[in-house]
Amino acid sequence: KEIQKAQINEVLPQKYIDTLIRMGITIHEGTTPPIVNGIYLANPTILLASTVVGDIIGNTFSDIKVKLTDQDNTNFGIKLYGKKLLGENDTSIVTAISGSGNNFTVYGKVKASATPTNYAIFAIVISGTLSADGIVNYQDALINIDNSKGATYFIPEGTGRLIKDGNNLASTTSFF
């Protein structure tokens, strides 16, 4: 449990997790997360909460693909890749996982690239329940924590969003 706590805190300081919890993300704690390696498609994606000026709750966003690989329940590491999660192509810098039974939460610090020279660093949490068809009750929450190279491609630094899958299932898919 201490290894997991250290891993999660390396990924996301508690203040960011607390902010995402205030926005409404579900956090599944525990040291026995299910093996979630796979590719998942969230669509439609619906905005549940936001601190971004001008956002309208209920708006939809582009379909999101999430690829989770190399899960290790000894050190609670996992790799996270995204398409349209934040930008065109998203890659985790450091990531951790928690959960028990079929419930899990992935914590990531992700580099979102808009162009080869424009990128931002986001804190992101993905949460849900693993099923045979994908991730039930899929949610993802994000905060821009470093927009120094992001220009105007991303939401302002310090702001965040909570998004869910509109039909409550991010379906398993084979193509990333």
Residue ranges and their predicted role:
Residues V36, S62-I64, F122-I124:
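Residues that flank catalytic or metal-binding motifs in active/ligand-binding sites
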Residues L41-N43, K109, T129, A141-L142:
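Residue-level recognition of well-ordered beta-strand positions that form the cores
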Residues H28, T74-K79, I143-I145:
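Low-complexity, flexible helical/coil segments
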Residues N118-F176:
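Glycine-rich, aromatic-bearing surface loops/beta-hairpins
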Residues A42, I46-S92:
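N-terminal glycine/threonine-rich, aromatic-flanked beta-hairpin/loop signature
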Residues D70-V136:
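Contiguous, well-ordered beta-strand patches that form the walls/edges
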Residues L47-G58, L85-N89, A112-A120, N144-I155:
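Short, cysteine-centered beta-strand-loop-beta hairpins and adjacent loop/turn segments enriched
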Residues K1-G54, D165-F176:
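Amphipathic/hydrophobic helical signal segments and adjacent flexible N-terminal regions
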